[in-house]
């Protein structure tokens, strides 16, 4: 009976996950002949080109890692007080969490495009600064849009409410008697937080960090809309190789490398 119940999900998993991954892995080795330029001969040339010195794609990967790390750290630091406030300070008003999340149920593209309107040369921010005579009308702040800063700002905005959830759950499950015991033993609020609350909520922090880092390292929609050439990321290169360049072997190499990195991170942080 158990085997019968598992057969459906297993077939689904093999057809729509394992098989596509194996196909992409085979393509990265040149084993599949799909286009006239494909040889169908197994070769590591694509991997050597990607991992070799001076590879623009490898450099782009590390650029994306730096940006994703920055976003993940900032988002985790900003989301922790939100989760702390909701879990330990306002237990009777947890509907605040719903109020925070509801605006983020709107279209992702609309929210990103809203930032584009706000940060443009004639957007809300520049117009306000011009109205306050902080900036001359003909000299807007150009780096507010189409830059690495813009990409990281928008990504942080998008992910903060969702990262607050695992932190909230972690803090909400804390044994309150431990906090009371620390207080009874004379520990200050700061010492109680540093010695009790923070260590016990560490799994939630790690989960929140990974929850942001893994998706953002391969992000391509946000850089495409608000990043320009400065905010171009690894995911954009991967997309361009498959769509514009039609270089599916190189695109498969980039995709498999990202999959290996993500799988490694999941294995590393899985114990949390």
Residue ranges of model-derived segments:
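Cytoplasmic-entry segments and transmembrane alpha-helices of multi-pass inner-membrane transporters
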Residues: 2-6, 82-118, 179-180, 193-194, ...
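Transmembrane alpha-helices
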Residues: 7-18, 102, 157, 163-176, ...
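Hydrophobic alpha-helical transmembrane segments of polytopic membrane proteins
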Residues: 9, 151-154, 210, 232-269
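Short membrane-interfacial helix/loop motifs at transmembrane-helix boundaries
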Residues: 18-55, 122-123, 227-229
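Glycine-rich helix-loop "coupling/hinge" segments at transmembrane-helix boundaries
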Residues: 34-40, 220-248
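Transmembrane alpha-helix signature in integral membrane proteins
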Residues: 55-86
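Membrane-interfacial helix termini and adjacent extracytoplasmic/periplasmic loops
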Residues: 112-156, 190, 226-230
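C-terminal transmembrane helix and the adjacent membrane-cytosol boundary/short C-terminal tail
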Residues: 168-179, 183, 252-272
């Amino acid at each position: 009976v158990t085997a019968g119940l598992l057969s459906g999900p297993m077939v689904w998993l093999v057809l729509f996950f394992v098989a596509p991954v194996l196909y992409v892995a085979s393509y990265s080795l040149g084993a599949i002949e799909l286009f006239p330029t494909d040889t169908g001969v197994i070769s590591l040339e694509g991997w050597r080109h990607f991992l070799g010195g001076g590879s623009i794609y490898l450099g782009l990967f590390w650029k994306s890692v730096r940006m994703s790390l920055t976003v993940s750290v900032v988002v985790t630091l900003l989301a922790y007080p939100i989760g702390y406030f909701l879990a330990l300070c306002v237990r009777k008003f947890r509907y605040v969490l719903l109020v925070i999340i509801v605006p983020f149920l709107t279209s992702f593209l609309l929210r990103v495009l809203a930032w584009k309107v706000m940060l443009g040369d004639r957007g809300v921010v520049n117009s306000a600064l011009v109205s306050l005579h902080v900036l001359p009308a003909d000299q807007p702040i150009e780096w507010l849009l189409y830059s690495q800063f813009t990409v990281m700002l928008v990504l942080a905005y998008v992910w903060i409410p969702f990262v607050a959830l695992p932190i909230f759950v972690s803090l909400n499950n804390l044994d309150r008697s431990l906090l009371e015991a620390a207080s009874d033993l004379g520990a200050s609020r700061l010492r109680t937080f540093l010695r009790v609350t923070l260590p016990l909520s560490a799994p939630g922090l790690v989960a929140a960090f990974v929850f942001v880092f893994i998706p953002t390292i391969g992000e391509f929609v946000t850089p495409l809309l608000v990043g320009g050439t400065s905010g171009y990321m690894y995911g954009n290169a991967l997309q361009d190789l498959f769509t514009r360049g039609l270089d599916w072997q190189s695109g498969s190499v980039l995709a498999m490398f990202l999959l290996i990195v993500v799988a490694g991170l999941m294995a590393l942080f899985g114990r949390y």
